[in-house]
Amino acid sequence: AILGAPFMLFTLAIFLLAVTVLTLKFMGKRDSAIKVNPELISFDLKFFIFAFFLILAVSLIKIKFLNYALAAFLVLFYLFYIKKILEHEAAGDETYHPLHFEKYFGKKHVLIYIQTALGLILIISGAHFFIGFLIVTGTAIGISMLVFSLLITPIATELPEKYNSITWIIRGKDTLALANITGAVAFQSTLIVSIGLLFTEWILDWHTLLNITLALSSAIFIFITLKFKKKLYAEPLLIGGLFYVIYIILALELVKI
């Protein structure tokens, strides 16, 4: 589940983002160019690629001390990321809507804490329910729990929140839409992975290594496209769906290699 989230975001979520843009283009509401802040998105991509290459290397070396060292580095690396992001100046389309509670009670800081706490309670409750469902379902259908968690868990936990990206794309807030994905990946690939490195055996089989490789491939492809074209178009981002299908086929052994 830890490594499945970055994979899902850089494959399925990116694919759905591209499909949304192309649907709007077909409806005559926009073109296929995704108008993002190239400096911000490039930084997110470089951050993820560097972090995930380190994770892949340490995972292959299999020395416990390196796991602890990398976990500490990833925490510091994410703090560096936060510092750089806070220095970023908001683009013209980066506007925000008020909290839901503000509509009824006015703008008060206590509402921020209340809405955050309620959201956290719902997330924790949903996680307990989902884990139980995952165990029962995986056992019933006979699929490896690792493969099942890599494929299903990120969809259930990450994809609903990424609906925000779809909403922002529809509203023409392209930088917010893509940064919602790349920013989440930055968090998932550092702080969350550091927890796994510290508190699990961190022995990765070929399913997980394939997962990491495809996530990296998608991120590198997007980075190269942005680097040379200075902008992104929806059509090339459809490759995220291809990477996701490739993983399903190989992980479920629908095709023998």
PLM-predicted stretches and their roles:
Residues 1-257:
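Hydrophobic alpha-helical segments, chiefly the membrane-spanning helices
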